């Protein structure tokens, strides 16, 4: 996953809509869904979708008459990528460790339990992904 930036409010609303659908959506479909909650121009939604496509967050599918858009990554994968990118901003391992400690101090009991389970699976060798920042073979 490429380096990510935090999503703006409208980008997040567009992504939330796309994640809630099983089929790729046209600009019109996204516009109609979002316009029910806020006043938006069709061209604004189109621009946001095009920018999300340039960021490789949505896939632009060309149909006969309209473009359809689908998320490239699931919500969980995108959020995890944002967290890894934020952690990578630390200059050294000591700073990364301190950032992790501050993060863990702020999570709730359910999230802490999920972290414990994930770490236990990773230590048991059942993790399905390399640790963040680990080199991968190409």
Curated annotation (Swiss-Prot):
**Record-stated family:** Belongs to the BlaI transcriptional regulatory family.
Organism (species): Mycobacterium tuberculosis (strain ATCC 25618 / H37Rv)
Q: Which Gene3D superfamilies match?
A: 6.10.140.850, Winged helix-like DNA-binding domain superfamily/Winged helix DNA-binding domain
The positions annotated as site (Cleavage) read 102-103
Residues of the DNA-binding region: 6-71
Query: What protein am I looking at?
Result: Transcriptional regulator BlaI
One Pfam match, given by its short name, reads Penicillinase_R
Assembly notes? Homodimer.
């Amino acid at each position: 996953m490429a380096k990510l930036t935090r999503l703006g409010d409208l980008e997040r609303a567009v992504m939330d809509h796309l994640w809630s659908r099983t089929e790729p959506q046209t600009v019109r479909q996204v516009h109609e869904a979002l316009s029910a909650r806020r006043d938006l121009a069709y061209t604004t939604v189109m621009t946001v979708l095009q920018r999300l496509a340039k960021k490789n967050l949505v896939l632009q599918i060309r149909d006969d008459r309209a473009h359809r858009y689908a998320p490239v990554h699931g919500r969980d994968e995108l959020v995890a990528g944002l967290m890894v990118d934020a952690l990578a901003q630390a200059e050294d391992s000591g700073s990364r460790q301190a950032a992790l400690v501050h993060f863990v101090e702020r999570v709730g009991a359910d999230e802490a339990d999920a972290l414990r389970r994930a770490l236990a699976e990773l230590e048991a060798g059942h993790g399905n992904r390399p640790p963040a920042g680990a080199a991968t073979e190409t």
